[in-house]
Curated annotation (Swiss-Prot):
Protein's UniProt keywords contain Nucleotide-binding: yes
Essential cofactor(s): Mg(2+)
Cofactor binding, note field: Binds 1 Mg(2+) ion per subunit.
Positions contributing to substrate binding: 265, 322-324
Protein name: Succinate--CoA ligase [ADP-forming] subunit beta
Organism: Psychrobacter cryohalolentis (strain ATCC BAA-1226 / DSM 17306 / VKM B-2378 / K5)
C-alpha cells in the first residue's frame, strides 16, 4: 500500500525528520486560503497521486499569488495526471498539497531504503544526485549510489550514518543532523513495516539545514492487519479497481498491460505461465493466483475480474490440481461463463487431481472452450486464438 506525499511526510515528521511543511486543499478556494498561511512568498502546488514524475507531467507548479494558487488547483483537481509511472489513463487528482517554497538550495541529495532480498536486511541507499530519477542514476552512474546494509540485531549504528554523511559531502553540524535524520528514517521503516522509503530530494538549504522536500513510502500490505492507523490512510481512488476487488476474495491479482488474461493456481506456476505466453509471442494482461485452497466462489470471482478488463482478448486457465480439484475448477469455469457474457476465446489446461473428470465436465458442458494438453500447447493455442 502506497502513501501520498503529505502522508509520508507527516509520518517522517513524527520520527523527528525535518520536512517541507504544507496544507492539503480540496478546492481552489482552500488552496488560496492555504497560500495565505504559507510562510514563504512563493508556494508550491503539488498534485497528490501515487506516482512519481509529477513535475514533468505538470503536477507540481510554483505560484506567487493566492489567485494563482486557486487557478492552478482548480486546473489540477478532477483531472487524471499521466506520468512515466502511470498507465495511459493516469491517476486521479482529488486534492493538492500547498507547500512552502524551499528554494534556492545548496544541493539536492537522495536517501532511500528498501528490504534487500539477497542480504535479507534493510538496505539504505544514498546519492549526491538528488532531484532526478534514481533509476536513471543507477543505470548510467551506479558508482554515485552508496549502499548500507543494516544488521537487524543491532539496528542502524551512528558510525554507518556518519559514513553516509561524509560520502554525501556533508560537514560540520550537518553531520549530526543527518545522523539523527537517517536514524529516524530507519526507526520509521522498521516500526511501520515499510518496504520502500524514498526522500528525493533531500535538500541542503542555503542556511545549511537539511530538509525532506519530498517523500515516498510503500507499506507491506501483508502487515496492514497490525497497522490500523496506517491502513486507514489508504486512498482506494489511487488503486486498481480490479486489484481491490480481488483482495476482497483473497485473490492475488496484479494488472498488467497485455491482452491475454491468466487464471492460475500457485504463484510459481502463474509466473511460468506468463513467461511462456511471452515466449510464444503473447502479452499477459494480469497475474492472478487463485491459491492452493481456492473455492468455487473464488474461482468464479477470479474469472469475472479477468473479464472486467476491456483489454483482455483471450483467457488462459492453467490449473494443476493438488489441494484444488480440477473437477471443482471445471464447474466454477462453467458457472462463471454462464454468469458472464464471454465473447473471447478461453483455453483450459487441467493437470493433476481429477484432471480427467474436469476435462469431461468441460466437454459435456457444450461451451466453446479450447482444451490444451501441457503448458506449451496451452500457450500456443491462446496466442493463436487471440491473433485469429
Amino acid at each position: 500500500m502506497n502513501l501520498h506525499e503529505y502522508q509520508a511526510k507527516e509520518l517522517l515528521k513524527s520520527y523527528g525528520l525535518p520536512i517541507q511543511e504544507g496544507i492539503i486543499a480540496y478546492s481552489g478556494d482552500e488552496a488560496a486560503a492555504a497560500f495565505d498561511k504559507t510562510p514563504t512568498d512563493i508556494a508550491v502546488i503539488k498534485a497528490q497521486v501515487h506516482a512519481g514524475g509529477r513535475g514533468k507531467a505538470g503536477g507540481v507548479k510554483l505560484v506567487k499569488t493566492r489567485e494563482e494558487a486557486k487557478q492552478v488547483t482548480d486546473e489540477l483537481i478532477g483531472k487524471n495526471l499521466v506520468t512515466y509511472q502511470t498507465d495511459a489513463a493516469g491517476q486521479p487528482v482529488n486534492f493538492v498539497l500547498v507547500a512552502e517554497d524551499m528554494y534556492p538550495v545548496q544541493t539536492e541529495l537522495y536517501l532511500g531504503a528498501v528490504v534487500d532480498r539477497s542480504s535479507r536486511r534493510v538496505t539504505f541507499m544514498a546519492s549526491t544526485e538528488g532531484g532526478v530519477e534514481i533509476e536513471k542514476v543507477a543505470e548510467e552512474t551506479p558508482e554515485k549510489i552508496f549502499k548500507v546494509n543494516i544488521d537487524p540485531l543491532v539496528g542502524l549504528l551512528p558510525f554507518q550514518a556518519r559514513e553516509v554523511a561524509f560520502k554525501l559531502g556533508l560537514e560540520g553540524k550537518q553531520i549530526n543532523q543527518f545522523v539523527k535524520l537517517m536514524s529516524g528514517a530507519y526507526q520509521a521503516f522498521v516500526e511501520n513495516d515499510i518496504d520502500l522509503l524514498e526522500i528525493n530530494p533531500l535538500a541542503v538549504r542555503e542556511n545549511g539545514e537539511i530538509v525532506c522536500v519530498d517523500g515516498k513510502i510503500g507499506i507491506d500490505s501483508n502487515a496492514l492487519y497490525r497497522l490500523p492507523k496506517i491502513a486507514a490512510l489508504q486512498d482506494k481512488s489511487q488503486e486498481n479497481e480490479r486489484e481491490l476487488k480481488a483482495a476482497e476474495f483473497d485473490l492475488n491479482y496484479v494488472a498488467l498491460e497485455g491482452n491475454i488474461g491468466c487464471m492460475v493456481n500457485g504463484a510459481g506456476l502463474a509466473m511460468a505461465t506468463m513467461d511462456i505466453i511471452k515466449l510464444y509471442g503473447g502479452k499477459p494482461a494480469n497475474f492472478l493466483d487463485v491459491g492452493g485452497g481456492a473455492t468455487k466462489d473464488r474461482v468464479v470471482e477470479a474469472f469475472k475480474i479477468i473479464l472486467e478488463d476491456s483489454s483482455v482478448e483471450g483467457v488462459l486457465i492453467n490449473i494443476f490440481g493438488g489441494i484444488v480439484r480440477c473437477d471443482m475448477i471445471a464447474e466454477a469455469i462453467i458457472a462463471a461463463i454462464k454468469e458472464v457474457d464471454v465473447k473471447v476465446p478461453v483455453v483450459v489446461r487441467l493437470e493433476g487431481n481429477n484432471a480427467e473428470l474436469g476435462a469431461q465436465i468441460l466437454e459435456e458442458s457444450g461451451l466453446k472452450l479450447i482444451s490444451a494438453q501441457g503448458l506449451s500447447d496451452a500457450a500456443q493455442k491462446i496466442v493463436d486464438a487471440v491473433k485469429a
